[in-house]
Amino acid sequence: MRMLKHHKTNSSCNRNISAFDAISKSQEIVYSPMIFQTVYVLVNHNILKFIEDCKNGIAFNDLIKKTDFNDYALGLLLDVAVSASIIYLDDNGLYHLSKIGYFLQNDRMTRISLDFVKHVCYRGLDSLEDSLLTLEPCGLKDFNKSWQTIYPHLSELPTNAQQAWFAWDHFYSQTSFLNAIKIIDSSIKPRMVYDIGGNTGDFARTYLQYNHNIKVKILDLPSQIRLSKENFKDNNYNGRIDFEEIDILTHSFTEKCSADVIWLSQFLDCFAKEHIAMILKNLNDFMRDDTVLCILEPIADRQKFDAARLSINCGSLYFNTIANGYSKFLSTKELE
């Protein structure tokens, strides 16, 4: 696969910040958990939407009639929202949605991340310190004390957590699938693709719809293969989709490789460095000389925007505290 242009991070961007701005930012950081929970309630109870729908602003007494809260509770939410620049008050005492509030309410990426942090990560992140010290996903116990990693149990998560997990996982990969497929199809022209760690089969489906001659095999844990098969039960694309249950850490590829392309999308970030080295060696031994290994990963130091770098780096805390205890989103240097 082609490597994206490397956008260097600007590590000195905040070195010249004033003391006043620095302490203000510090206060925002330490109170950010409270702001986050406030935002979730405002979104979940449609309060931001009610304010947005009133183009000329809305008075407190009119807004309270639309909510489930009394004047005390609503006042708390609105006070924080104003202080955090999510909404603002005009000179007539009417509430309006700010530009920040607009994106919190309407931006799909932001809403997906909000639900993921709330339903998958938030409670578990209280165990971050223990997870970092032990290299175990101590926050996972909030779902089930006996689980060792999250992956075999995705189908067992509470509904809101399961939906949030898959929405988050799919959003940051699905947006790249078609572009990646076009590159693969035009430059490699494969006939058979192995999608290792294929999850629910979205990459496979996208490729099968794009190229009506391609064949795809999804290889994943048994729990994930069950989900994939369920998603293809109404359309097997004339037999062009196949499935195989494997645990990549213990699987021995003894059969002859029929893959022209082996596809790993947001897969290596689920493993420790020593596991990654072992996986890649095993795949290299399995591949034909003309098989091409294609890897798609979010890389923090290749991002153009600060918010993207922050999102990816914070996502690595999920891997430590919730997913497995030992993996992370990889840097350019680590991949090389």
Task: Write out the residue ranges for each language-model feature.
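Conserved Class I S-adenosyl-L-methionine-dependent methyltransferase catalytic core
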Residues: C13-D53, K66, Y72-R191
